[in-house]
Amino acid sequence: MRLSSLWFGLVFSLSGAVAIADVPADPAKVQALKVGDAAPAFSGLSVDGVERTFPAGAYAKPTVVIFYRGGWCPYCNLQLADLRLVEPRLRASGFEVVFLSTDRPELLYSSLKEKDIHYTLLSDHHSAAAEAFRVAYRLDDATLAELREYGIDVEATTGTKRHELPVPSVFVIDKAGVIRFVYSNPDYTVRLGADALWSAASGLAAR
């Protein structure tokens, strides 16, 4: 019995190691899921630590999934502020709009520079959702050191030692769970704007 338990633990550990090994160390090598791919099941934690789950195969409504790095990132704050121009229109058109970052649940709102934001922010601090959508990448030691010089401790903000972030990405997914639009850019300073997101999603909303 003990031997079988040890074997199970070994298999589990190896599978986890394989998953981490599959995450590129260079954001330019990230290959996000594509238009026409089935969206994976994913989940995230609310600021209260409540898990929100999105099963694969079918969603209750068309869904926009937005990956951003964290509330500590100035470009993320600019993007979240810009998307206030379109997020209410998306919801009024029947979309679920979900924002995922690697921030710990308790940091989701408190870390933002702009406080007047009422989005559905979910914590993906273990990067499981980012890995499932294939937008995660590993930070090398030089990048971690550079971030620390700016007062950003990724282990503290995520609560893990995984040293992963998502490439900023946007997925528009239909009710059948099929990805209909993808924006993913390894240059974290360039983000999808509100007008472009509405153009991408409005056609699906009209169906």
Where are the model-predicted features located?
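Bacterial N-terminal signal peptides
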Residues: 4-17
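N-terminal "domain-start" segment that seeds a small globular fold
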Residues: 23-56
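Thiol/selenol-based redox catalytic cores and closely related redox-interacting motifs
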Residues: 124-189
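Short active-site neighborhood of thiol/selenol oxidoreductases, capturing the structured segment around
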Residues: 55-81
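Short loop/turn microsegments at loop-to-beta-strand junctions
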Residues: 39-40, 62, 167-169
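Solvent-exposed coil/turn segments that connect beta secondary-structure elements
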Residues: 59, 70, 102-103, 126-127, ...
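Structural microenvironment flanking redox-active thiols in thiol-disulfide oxidoreductases
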Residues: 78-134
